[in-house]
């Protein structure tokens, strides 16, 4: 592991950086792609059995991961041993993507090469563009991304041997081009425009904003995208990750696993909960109206979407940053 001063992300907080980028016993070299391909990792992210009453399979260890731990102290989140609060506002998203996919924070030289690789993967095959053009404007963005992954998997399929370097390349490609796919569909479906999806922007977040607005974004907007993408890059053994691993466990290809994971994330009891929460908030015309309705819901013992978490018993550590 290189010295910390050689990393592109050099800020060291008062908490300090761990000597090793993984947990105790973590080899620190397994990638996100490996997590989909293998059921044996060197460390477990499962909290010792703390079953909760009436919460399905709560307390049952479902598998192992070296990538991420959630809520071990009630309000913490770590990526390969790094505290999310140490990296969210200091690192670029590409650094954290490299950490998760390739096993360690990149050096400055490695980051430069990685960014160049991701820029080269932003384009979309013609067949994928035609598929996106066939989708109606009323399509949900999550459905568009699910379809895009499936289409890319048909045009650029994974090798039959499902080797790990190839799986990592697929992970990099999807990170680089899913924003391109979503915004190509958006502009075509809503404005009839076939946009050029290959920009010279230095980051995935900057590229997305450039395609969305049709012009290079400000540094402040790019920084906000870096922070947001980092905060939500990984979250241990959630429903979509579990879905991916079930599909990969049948020896299905990487694209099938990711497509299934997006389908799980689409659900209102997983990633879709954010959308439900936003829709509820949009109903209120004034703060007083919101307070009255929330109090009514609490009095009726109704679920108030957007509050609480099944794992974080104290608070979600991402909140203080994203606010």
Protein language model regions, located:
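Short intrinsically disordered terminal tails
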Residues: 37-38
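Hydrophobic alpha-helical bundle cores within soluble ligand-binding/oligomerization subdomains
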Residues: 42-323
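A cross-taxon signal for low-complexity, glycine/charged-rich
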Residues: 1-4, 8-14, 19-33
